[in-house]
Amino acid sequence: MNYFSKLSCSWRITLGYLLFMLILPILALLSRASQELFSNFWSIAMEPAAIYAYSITLSMALIASIVNGIFGIFIAWILVRYNFPGKRIVDAAIDLPFALPTSVAGLTLATVYSEKGWIGHFLQSLSIKVVFTKLGVGVAMIFVSFPFVVRTLQPVLQDIEKELEEAAWSLGASSWTTFWKVIFPSLIPSLLTGIALAFSRAVGEYGSVVIIASNIPFKDLTAPVLIFQKLEQYDYTGATVIGTVILSISLFILVGINIIQSLNQMYSK
């Protein structure tokens, strides 16, 4: 009797689902890319347009995840610690990027931030252009990845005992000192998780970016859009190679963050 036959039905279903929905697609991508490894993999992966697309994608995703990390802390704090009219509506609106099709999100952002839009008209007077620029790419990534940080921080903030803050206050600590010395250290693992999830979501964003950006090489073309352009040109090899590079970078960053989290939890005990 082999090991697989000893597994319970629930384990078999779980492993089967992960195999067909996650593992096999990744292996298929890597297998197809490996066919080009000894011929022109690196020449395709290191094309100037591809390198610039990587830099735009990763830099904008990093900025978006950091921005969401900063504002996510404050928003999660307000939603957990304060009661105010319309709180449930605000809390439900946090999940809007999850439910909204990315193409609709891109159209909405392009409308609002266009030169004649509500926000874009004001920014235009400050000589700031969002639509069809790298800034627009960043705005789209911030929008679609925003909920991850808030939703990962909320349960942690709810579990923090109010008595810890009161004890710090009784010892003369200010509210700001209490937050940084007492509350923030316990938020670090969840914050890193939320930022990592936001980063991963932003790196793979296509639907909203393709609408709000001009998608011109060496300007604001991102890697996911470049992959789709390759597919439109029937360049399946190029699309596979670029996709493999982005996948590898994302996995490397996620593994690194998980290692940092593990070390942080180990030393905090």
UniProtKB/Swiss-Prot annotation:
One of its GO terms (cellular component) is plasma membrane. Its main location: plastid. The chain crosses the membrane at residues 10-30, 60-80, 92-112, 130-150, 179-199, 208-228, 240-260. The keyword Iron-sulfur does not apply. GO terms for molecular function: ABC-type sulfate transporter activity. PROSITE patterns: ABC_TM1. Part of the ABC transporter complex cysAWTP (TC 3.A.1.6.1) involved in sulfate/thiosulfate import. Probably responsible for the translocation of the substrate across the membrane. PANTHER family: SULFATE TRANSPORT SYSTEM PERMEASE PROTEIN, SULFATE TRANSPORT SYSTEM PERMEASE PROTEIN CYST. This is Probable sulfate transport system permease protein cysT. It comes from Mesostigma viride.
